[in-house]
From Swiss-Prot:
Compartments where located: Cytoplasm
Protein's job: Activates KDO (a required 8-carbon sugar) for incorporation into bacterial lipopolysaccharide in Gram-negative bacteria.
Keyword Chloroplast: no
A GO cellular component annotation in the UniProt record: cytosol
An annotated Gene Ontology molecular function: 3-deoxy-manno-octulosonate cytidylyltransferase activity
Top class in the EC scheme: transferase
Family from the record: Belongs to the KdsB family.
Entry EC no(s): 2.7.7.38
HAMAP family recorded: KdsB
The protein, known as: 3-deoxy-manno-octulosonate cytidylyltransferase
Spans through the membrane: none
Domain of life: Bacteria
Amino acid sequence: MSFVVIIPARFSSTRLPGKPLLDINGKPMIVHVLERARESGAERIIVATDHEDVARAVEAAGGEVCMTRADHQSGTERLAEVVEKCGFSDDTVIVNVQGDEPMIPAVIIRQVAENLAQRQVGMATLAAPIHGAEEAFNPNAVKVVLDAEGYALYFSRATIPWDRDRFAKSLETVGDTFLRHLGIYGYRAGFIRRYVNWQPSPLEHIEMLEQLRVLWYGEKIHVAVAKEVPGTGVDTAEDLERVRAEMR
């Protein structure tokens, strides 16, 4: 099947300035992400950035760049600019791979594209089982609950679903009902065009989760369990050192 990968790579970061260019064992982080995307079999891979230094690093590695504005409020808005500049048809399958995921498995990039292509829906994503209480109660681990057909009912930083009887006895263990949302998305280009014209929803402001805008406006998001769980993403200096060690 044919699909396009777009990798948003914003230069500014509160915790890690210049994050896309941080060195991981001799290569900029964004180049590692580009290489994982190439392994997925994508027809085309575009790095969307707002900084010339990132563009130069990607082009030096043989990658394609689309320069975007620096004032986007989300990665999806940056994708929308690329969709318009490249003139993708509405039915083009686009996978959004985060620029700070140098250890993302290529197999799940393709998985989310295939899941979207097989369904009459505008958006798809992935999740992974949660087995430990620490992750289940961590607000930085976004939880998702699904309906019988694998479509998202809700995403939250809260512990959902709340296992009333189990948690009344102890908060030390969790069952097999929890799923952690993974930050990889597949979209049809036409859906991205519609999404950016919707006003932000109250729920996404409360949870700080932009995918809640989709549910707010009555659209569906298909969620599959990932074939392989991604390694550590890079949000902090500690994450960076961990990734450097794991990728040696």
